[in-house]
UniProtKB/Swiss-Prot annotation:
Keyword annotations of the record: Endosome, Golgi apparatus, Membrane, Phosphoprotein, Signal, Transmembrane, Transmembrane helix
Disulfide-bond pairs as recorded: none
Signal peptide: 1-23
Domain of life: Eukaryota
Tagged with keyword Lipoprotein: no
Name of the protein described by the UniProt record: Transmembrane 9 superfamily member 4
Taxonomy of the source species: Eukaryota, Metazoa, Chordata, Craniata, Vertebrata
Protein family (similarity comment): Belongs to the nonaspanin (TM9SF) (TC 9.A.2) family.
Compartment(s) of residence: Membrane; Golgi apparatus; Early endosome
Membrane topology value: Multi-pass membrane protein
Extracellular compartment spans: 24-282, 369-377, 439-450, 524-536, 593-599
GO biological process: cell adhesion; phagocytosis; positive regulation of protein exit from endoplasmic reticulum; positive regulation of protein localization to cell surface; protein localization to membrane; regulation of intracellular pH; response to hypoxia; vacuolar proton-transporting V-type ATPase complex assembly
Phosphotyrosine modification, residue list: Y313
Predominant place of localization: membrane
């Protein structure tokens, strides 16, 4: 115990330093050096909106197109995210300014949007879509300057807080009129690399910003060389899009370069730095204090009570007298009686082990910086493949538990483990994907990708689950310290607070309270297209979640056994996952208060994916709590003498 108390502060200090550290690039992600006037390619990623949750590819709208459209080959994670990276006609040269350039169209021949195109553009603007571009793999950002008064200052001066919004707004609405951002002012920052005296300077792109503007056709002056002159001052009017008729306009852009002290290795800090890091720290510290405080209280109560009970049981010569006044020892002959549906229980727990291993490895690897944000889709790709390969551990744990519960049909149990949870996930995703297909969104998983996922499931995960299940079933089952009686003991009438649903509500509060702040930022990253890269904090929260789930599970199973109810297997699994109920409640609260979703399909997508999240979280926390309780029950019954 003393060694553990010495080890914990060192562990927390290491994690704090990891949380504080900046993002770094893993080997193999090399910087690109540009020379003067080298082309810097601007690519489009997708269009996104937090109101619809339906991404679209860039050319789903009538933007100017290059002579040849070329889509980048994407990994699994990029496809699942809805990214469709494609080239654009923007001509940008390293450290070369452009005042104003026409993207497409001529001086006497502007771009004409048909009625259908105008209606589509107007619809996307009213749905608050953002356009996402990249230059040298850096996403474009819009600078936001927020002003707040300084309370500590006597003159109440305004302080400027600079934040960055990912992407740029497609347009805006004002007094029931719709306006399109048809001029983009690109601001690219470069870092000059040190070179020898006789060598030419090289440059690296370290930031990519844009200032979107809406400029009316009549206010732009276009010459024969496709150059343009922007209107001066505030005399110009924005470019209106009337969805009921054809619209004429120009798409234009300008390029400005600025030298920066930002080094290439830290260029992502602009996008990943959050102004609310203190909130994370306060949340972590509060959770750690609460968990340690409750750990002390629960440990004192349970350990002192158990020591007293075990000492009394081991001293008593008359077992019958002991049984008349005892609690949890009364059910020693039934506590390890196999529950109903042992195959389903072991299958769910096997999937929970699979999830636990996958999440632990992903968070740990990401915390070390090995899943760089520059590697788009790497996080999701890694998670998918890890879940497949962790099937061997899930199968092994499920097979051994199934044999411990007196199961005999191991082949059927292995198939159930390999298909039950993944089948539910695939079924829900397939139904949602049909709706996304119907909206022609890039978020729809293409048919070849779906076939590839099925091949991964049945070609990698299922055989590995069978392999692990085979060895787990052949291994010696868990050694239960007491024998099970042939005739089940009658269970006395339980008090109201021992009700299963009440237990779920009580047990879920502590784990959810330890993580709900971090849950807010995760929801913001998922549903509001924000970056999330504070995996050091997330790893801390995950450790706290594991500890709190284990504690609550042990306490709940102890009180259940004291009430002489030995049916703890399923109940403990359900109660330990009680925090998933609070995650569902929080998801509903977030939907009502944070998101502006009113249409059916976006709402269906939100609650469909939320269902998957809650189900996965229930499996994860239920598995953690179950194995903690199982170890506890075996420990306490091994400590007493049973005749």
């Amino acid at each position: 115990m003393a060694a553990a108390m010495i080890w914990w502060p060192r562990f927390l200090l290491l994690l704090c330093l990891t949380c504080k550290g900046s993002t770094f690039y893993v080997p193999g992600v090399a910087p690109i050096n540009f020379h003067q006037n080298d082309p810097v390619e601007i690519k489009a990623v997708k269009l996104t909106s937090s109101r619809t949750q339906l991404p679209y590819e860039y050319y789903s709208l009538p933007f100017c197109q290059p002579n040849k459209i070329t889509y980048k080959a994407e990994n699994l994670g990029e496809v699942l995210r809805g990214d469709r990276i494609v080239n654009t006609p923007f001509q940008v040269l390293m450290n070369s300014e452009k005042k104003c350039e026409v993207l497409c169209g001529q001086s006497n021949k502007p771009v004409i949007l048909t009625v259908e195109q105008s209606r589509l553009v107007a619809e996307r603007i009213t749905e608050e879509y953002y356009v996402h571009l990249i230059a040298d793999n850096l996403p474009v950002a819009t600078r936001l300057e927020l002003y707040s008064s300084n309370r500590d200052s006597d003159d109440k001066k305004k302080e400027k807080d600079v934040q960055f919004e990912h992407g740029y707004r497609l347009g805006f609405t004002d007094v029931n009129k719709i306006y399109l951002h048809n001029h983009l002012s690109f601001i690219l920052y470069y870092h000059r690399e040190d070179t020898e005296e006789d060598q030419e300077h090289t440059y690296r792109v370290v930031r990519f910003e844009v200032i979107p503007q809406s400029i009316r056709l009549e206010d732009l002056k276009i010459d024969e060389k496709s150059s343009c002159t922007l209107p001066e001052g505030a005399n110009s009017l924005p470019q209106e899009i009337d969805p009921t008729k054809e619209n004429q306009l120009y798409f234009t852009y300008s390029v400005h370069w600025e030298e920066s002290d930002i080094k290439w290795a830290s260029r992502w800090d602009t996008y990943l730095t959050m102004s609310d890091v203190q909130i994370h720290w306060f949340s972590i510290i509060n959770s750690v204090v609460v968990v340690f405080f409750l750990s002390g209280i629960l440990s004192m109560i349970i350990i002192r009570t158990l020591r007293k009970d075990i000492a009394n049981y081991n001293k008593e010569d008359d077992i019958e007298d002991t049984m008349e006044e005892s609690g949890w020892k009364l059910v020693h002959g039934d506590v390890f009686r196999p529950p109903q549906y042992p195959m389903i229980l072991s299958s769910l727990l096997g999937s929970g082990i699979q999830l636990f291993c996958m999440i632990l490895i992903v968070i740990f690897v990401a915390m070390l910086g090995m899943l760089s944000p520059s590697s788009r889709g790497a996080l999701m790709t890694t998670a998918c493949f890890l879940f497949m390969f962790m099937g061997v551990f899930g199968g092994f744990s499920a097979g051994r538990l199934y044999r411990t519960l007196k199961g005999h049909r191991w082949k059927k149990g292995a198939f159930c483990t390999a298909t039950l949870y993944p089948g539910v996930v695939f079924g829900i995703c397939f139904v949602l994907n049909c709706f996304i297909w119907g909206k022609h969104s890039s978020g729809a998983v293409p048919f070849p990708t779906m076939v590839a996922l099925l091949c991964m499931w049945f070609g990698i995960s299922l055989p590995l689950v069978y392999l692990g299940y085979y060895f787990g079933f052949r291994k010696q089952p868990y050694d239960n310290p007491v024998r099970t009686n042939q005739i089940p003991r009658q269970i006395p009438e339980q008090r109201w607070y021992m009700n299963r649903f009440v237990g779920i509500l009580m047990a879920g509060i502590l784990p959810f309270g330890a993580m709900f702040i971090e849950l807010f930022f995760i929801f913001s990253a998922i549903w509001e297209n924000q970056f999330y890269y504070l995996f050091g904090f997330l790893f801390l929260v995950f450790i706290i979640l594991v500890v709190s789930c284990s504690q609550i599970s042990i306490v709940m199973v102890y009180f259940q056994l004291c009430a002489e109810d030995y049916r703890w297997w399923w109940r403990n699994f359900l109660v330990s996952g009680g925090s998933a109920f609070y995650v569902l409640v929080y998801a509903i609260f977030y939907f009502v208060n944070k998101l502006d979703i009113v249409e059916f399909i976006p709402s269906l997508l939100y609650f469909g994916y939320t269902t998957l999240m809650v189900l996965s979280f229930w499996l994860l926390t239920g598995t953690i709590g179950f194995y903690a309780a199982y170890m506890f029950v075996r420990k306490i019954y091994a400590a007493v003498k049973i005749d």
